[in-house]
Amino acid sequence: MEKFINYTSVVIPIDRSNVDTDAIIPKQFLKSVEKSGFGDNLFDAWRYLDQGEPGEDCSNRPLNSDFILNQRAYREGKVLVARENFGCGSSREHAVWALRDFGIRTVIAGSYADIFFNNCFKNGVLPIILPSADIDALFECNQASGPFSMEIDLDRQTATTDSGQVYRFEMDNFKKKCLLEGLDDIALTMQHEGDISAYEQRRMTEVPWLFQDLSR
């Protein structure tokens, strides 16, 4: 997993509560277990005017010009802001894969569905929780002055707007370490490779019959 590096990006405001995983990546696109290739279908039903199909070239599909991701100022955004209960619905990890594949590295919301929240950390996406008053302020900032940027500093646990407003967020130390060092479940397991090998060797000595090739 790629290490999380502090960065500055335009903010993508999606002023909705209860954005579910089927809205993030519709069910018809869940046929692949690869983590890439989902970005074109992120928010597919909101982003396009037609019904998308798996494997379809999205470059010629009719766009919904009112949707935020189709507006030029927001297309390169890496920070998404929404309201409470983001990522609710089914537990598909593809939802985080789609956000990550599009380029979004941080989501800021009032709250999250638990499974989605934990899936973010396993895929290099930072889910920030802010009080509803702070979320309101971010949407008001966009409404008042248009597109704005934020600096995301995971080391200091701050999100700072280009006008200098600083928002501090809480973060579990272990999850923070995993993001900063790029550690997913496999990488965490491989940190104990020596202990695992030693255990396997010991078991082969203690119960050798468990390791016999029964196909012969």
Where are the model-predicted features located?
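Cytosolic catalytic domains that perform sulfur/thiol-centered chemistry
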Residues: 1-83, 87-115, 119-216
